[in-house]
Amino acid sequence: MRDICMHYGGLTRPSQTASSQISLLGENFQVHYFTGTSLPCLSVFKPIYFEGGVPELGERPTNKYSSKNYWWRFEVLHRKIQTNYRTYIADFLKDKNELQLKIIEKEVDFRKKYLEGKVDKCELSGLTKWAFDEEEKLLEKWNDIVKVGKLPLFYSMNWGRVNKKAGLIF
């Protein structure tokens, strides 16, 4: 594997990263940051605690597009950004990285309070839900901003075929 973040690239790279995880495994406490979405370079890592669980994320994913599915809602934005990458990437990453830092800072504070006995398991699940909700706001904002651009011919043909098979039309 050449990269941690593997973007679909047609014949030379016929698949892409589906989800990513970073785990902090302390002796007294573990937190697992998951994207739950493709392309970690464009995704937000959310803290998930086995003690707290995962919030409801909509219908289960399949290989067909559904606006009711968490993964597909983000996949639409990821694919739109790729069609106009240079136009949007700097501003998008600024917003995404600011949110990521906010999530990390809040998680570090919660973890400290949990270890001190000041936060219970219910509050851990609340932090996870808050992180997903904040990410959803980022998605809504950027789906409104990003306009579909034009990809190089062969790359566009490959993505067109993949999108058509999934029932995804821009």
What do these predicted ranges mean?
Residues 1-170:
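C-terminus-biased signal that marks the final domain/tail of proteins
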